[in-house]
Structures are given as C-alpha cells and as structure tokens.
Amino acid sequence: MESEAIQEDLQNLDVELKDVQGQISALIEHQDRLYERKSELKTLLKALAASGSPVASSGGSSAIENWSETFEWDSRADDVRFNVFGISKYRANQKEIINAIMTGRDVLVIMAAGGGKSLCYQLPAMLRGGTTLVVSPLLSLIQDQVMGLAALGISAYMLTSTSGKENEKFVYKALEKGEDDLKILYVTPEKVSKSKRFMSKLEKCHNAGRLSLISIDEAHCCSQWGHDFRPDYKNLSILKTQFPKVPMVALTATATQKVQNDLIEMLHIPKCVKFVSSVNRPNLFYSVREKSAVGKLVVDEIAEFIRESYSNNESGIVYCFSRKECEQIAGDLRERGISADYYHADMDANMREKVHMRWSKNKLQVIVGTVAFGMGINKPDVRFVIHHSLSKSMETYYQESGRAGRDGLPSECILFFRSADVPRQSSMVFYEYSGLQNLYDIVRYCQSKTKCRRSAFFRHFGEPSQDCNGMCDNCALSSEVKEVDVSDLSKLVVSMVQETQAKDQRVTMLQLGDKLRNKHKDLIAELKRDEVEHLVIKLIVDSVLKEEFQHTPYSTNAYVTMGPLANQLLQGRKTIKMETSSRQTKKLKRSITFSGLELKLDELRKEISAADGSILPHTVLSTQQIGSISSQKPVSLQELESIIGKLKTEKYGDRILEEVMRHEAVSEQLVEDPTKEETCKSRLRKRAKTQKDVVLVESSGEEEA
C-alpha cells in the first residue's frame, strides 16, 4: 500500500511538473513577444522624436538628414514625373526617397500598397543615366511593369525564364557593350543567384560605369521572419558585395521591425536611410463575416455582394485556400452571372497570363486565386478583395487585402471566417518560425466583435493608432456585445481532451465537438457545432489547449491536446470569456458613383487599350486623372496637358477632348440638332489647336529670353 501511495505521489508530481514546464514555456514565449514589442516601441519613439523625418537606420549616422530640401535635380525630376509618368504631385515620402537615392545612398522603403513604390526607383532610373537593375519575384508583375513603361516610351526590358533568345541576346549585348539604350532591366531573383552568365554581363556593365541603381522589390521575401520568405532572395547580398558603390533601394509594403532589421543585414545595407510610411489605408473598409458551413451559401453571399455593390463590372479578387476551391468557386460565380475565372500555380503559364491580362484589361471582373496571384499587381482600380478562407497571418492578410483601392478610392476588404478553417491553415504553417503564433493573431482579429479592425494592423506593425472614421464593421455597425463567462463549459472541453490523452488517443477539433455533444447532451445540446468549434479555437488561441501535428502519406493532420494553461483552468485559477453579439449582417452601400463623363472616359481608355494590345487601361488614364478631367472639363490641349502631362496629351489628347466636348454637347441638349453638334465640336477642336500653337510660341519666346 505504501509503495502504491508513493507511486501515486510521483504521478501527481509528474503532472504538476508538466504543468509548471508548460507555464514556463508560455511565459518564455510571452517574454520574447514583449521584448520584440519593446524594440518596436523604441524605434517608434525615435521616429516620433524626428518629427516624421526619416533617419539613418541602425548602424548608420544618427543625424537627421533633410531630404525635403532643394536639390539640383528637382526641376528635371518634376518634368519627368509629370510629363513622362503623368503624375501631378508626389505622394508621401516619394520625393524624399528619390532625393536620398539620387545622392547615392542605400535606401529601405516600407510603404503601404498604393503608396507609389515603383516611382521611387523608376524616376531615379530616368535621371541617373546608365542601367537600373530591378529584382522582382513574380513574372506577371515584371510583365505588367515592362508593358507600362514601354507605353510611356521608357526603354525597359526583362530577362526571365520565358525570355526569347532574341530578347536575351539584345539584353546581354546592351549590358556588355552599352550600344543600345537599356534604361531599366527587370529580372527574377533566380537569375541573380543561378545564372553565372548574367552576373558576368552585369559585372561588365558595372566596370564600364553603366550600372547606376539596384532595386529589390518585395524585399520582405529576403527575411525568414517575413510572411513570404523565398530562398533565392537570400542570395541577393551578392549584389552589394560585388557592386558596393552602386546605390541599392529595397522596397516592401509590409515589414515588422524584426523583418526590417533582418533584411538590412541580409542585403548588406547597414547604413541605409530608412523611410517608413504609415500602414493605414484610410480608403479601405475592413469587415469579417461569419462563414457558413454550407459552401453554396457562402458563394451565394459573395455573388449577391458583387451584384449589388459593383454592378458596373468593377474589378475584384476572391482568395481561396486551395487550387481546387479556386476552380470550384470561379465556376459557381459564373453560374450566378459573375464574370470570373481562376488563377493558381498549377495552371499552364500561358493560361495564367491570359487570365491575368483579361482581368487587367477589365474584360474579366473577378479573379479567384490562391496566394500565387497578386503580389505587386499593377492594377490600381481593384474595388474589392474577398477572402473566402482565412489568411495565414496579419502580414499576409494586410498584403493581400491591400491590393484593393490602390488608386485611393473607397474599396472593401471582406474576410469570411469559420473556426473549421483554422486547422486547415495551421497544418500548413506549423513548421514555419512563429507560424502558429502568426496564425492565431489573425484568428483573434476575426473573433473580435468590438475592437477596431484597423487598430489591429497598427498594433501588429508597431505604429501609433489613428482614427478609423467608421471604416470597419466593428466601428461602423452598432451592436450590443456581451462578454459571457464560459469557464465551466471550457472545463468540460479540456477534461474531454485530458481523458482522450489518458487513453493514449488523439482527437481532432471536429471529433472533439462530436464527442462533447454526445457525452454532455443535456449541457450543450443548444450549442451548434460551429459554436463548439469556436470555443475550441478560443481555448487554443488562449494556450489552454494546443495543436499538435502528425504526418500521413497523404496529408498533415492537426490534433487538439492539453495546452500549458490547461491545469490553471481546471483548478479554477483561469477564466475564459467569449464575446457574443446581437449584430446582424447589415448591407453597407460603399460602391462608387461615377458621372456620365467618367464612364465615357473609362470606356475610352478600355478602347485605346484594346486597340493597342500592349498597354493596360489605367496606363492610358488613371482613375484620378479621369476624375480630374471630369471635374475640370478642359477645352484645349493646353488645359488637358496641365492635368495629364505632355506625353499622354500628345498620344491621346485629341480623343479625350473629343469625348469631353461630346459629353458637354449632350449636356447642353445640342444632340437634337446634329448640325449644331458638329459645328460645336468643330469650333472647339479649332480653338484647342489654336491655343496649343499659342502655348508653343510663348514657350519658345521664354527660352530665347
């Protein structure tokens, strides 16, 4: 008997020690997160102390440098910005970034999607002379950029796995001998890390003094702490090693302080100037919707939303978890009258390109894609991004949802959340460093019924909070939210897991829900399966339970086990509370209303794009430019040039003015008499030409003076 008592004591001690070890692990993990947060806050304090002025990054000079002052290239930069790129004014930090690059400094740019990162290296490429090398991860992005630059008359080429022999021959000759004009060269990171021939030609270009700038786009791919780490990006440090005096600019939309430090080290740019813009996207409306367990109902809701809010064929993206889901949901949307097609990595490259171009040219309203679609897409007028499934982290969701509204106009970001999606994602990310913690962060974002969605991004990226202005569901929709103590029910859940483990068995979240409902019918009969799963996920996120994973020949399964804080709950030292809300899904009309002239100009840019075949509609006229033309209604090429710049006026000015004049004629009800309309249009065209001639004469006179 005495030995049995001792044995029992030993078992109790083992249980208690295991509990203590679990608590220690949880505390250490919490300590690491606190240290990381402390580091972010210190960096934030330094930035605030600098009154918004960018400062040299750690390792560089601590002196504040004024990149907003006047520089010798200012007038040339303004001329190229407006007359070549058609951009009327700089956005936040663009001018300062360009000035830092022009002085020969290495630069790190953290700028939200739609902030204008591309101009930050494309404009210096035009000003510095020689060749600018741009490393970009995706072929579709490279093709978009090269096409857009070619439409502006800029000599841009790409060297990728799909490049033809003639193109490759031209590029290598231009790099080696400099006989042909090669202003911007786009390559994938694989070309840098794996092609000795390319690096040899690039070295000859450098030795001849013609390599003027190196740009690393989507730079977060360098960091193992980033949400989209790519091994080939690790080898890009060779560029700074081989060409130490060539300025390098690294750009990304998302990077925590940890990621920033990592990529600075990996790219060998310790003395870079760092520009960090706000992560806030005030034009985006964020919302989370409960996802039905019935797939048909989810697609019905998505289709209804698109039909009611975006009936003018405005572009959108629907993200899905798997390739199979992409194909299924694209087909389901088509059956419901939505113009949709799918995009994923298993497709033939030509098919992917075809779908991408149809969507880019507004011939297809919705792309249904996996994460393979979208990084750095060059389409500013995406009006909505819908996540049919959960993203794997806050950073990933910020990046993917941020593909909406890059033109600054109101757009929507909707995430459909269901607890059953969590194990699907966790079994994919558990092997990544902090993969589970990152996933649980976005689960908290989805489960919250009171906290501002936007503030979650501020906290995650270590940025001071800003007003949401009602641009998320939790801030815009009033509802009665209650906190309910579910500790007793949680104890039943944990006890069930404990019993299962004692029998040396495993249980998935779905199995756990069924077992609970069968064993405790009287207590939880009123709870639906979704509500039980919601509680289990809450316990996992709160470290009361945890997920463990087992590989099979065909998949990786997620099982629920006891977490580090389980015994605290069972002993009554921890309470579990959940938010309940009476809020019903309310339809918010957030679509944009375009005037008649704006719609006509939109049709015109699509027509020009289709006729040319090699340019995208927004390259012809941006949505902002259409808005400016519609409000100012120019009647001469001179007035139009002041809105869209010289290059676009020369290319498309006559057709744009004709559309404006036709619209004005209709507005004045001149269409009733065709002769009057023709007379009016003829008179206005003549007046436009005369005013253009006068401007040119005045310009010549000023130059002579």
UniProtKB/Swiss-Prot annotation:
Region Disordered, annotated ranges: 668-705
SUPFAM superfamilies associated with the record: HRDC-like (SSF47819), P-loop containing nucleoside triphosphate hydrolases (SSF52540)
Tissue-level expression: Expressed in shoots and flowers. Expressed in young leaves, inflorescences, roots, shoot apical meristem, young siliques, and mature green siliques.
Residue ranges that the Swiss-Prot or TrEMBL entry lists as coiled coil: 1-30
Reactions the enzyme catalyzes: Couples ATP hydrolysis with the unwinding of duplex DNA by translocating in the 3'-5' direction; ATP + H2O = ADP + phosphate + H(+)
EC nos: 5.6.2.4
Cofactor: Mg(2+); Mn(2+)
Any one GO MF annotation of this record: ATP binding
Entry superkingdom: Eukaryota
Gene Ontology terms describing biological process: DNA recombination; DNA repair; DNA replication
Family: Belongs to the helicase family. RecQ subfamily.
Name recorded for this polypeptide: ATP-dependent DNA helicase Q-like 2
Source organism of the structure: Arabidopsis thaliana
Gene this protein is translated from: RECQL2
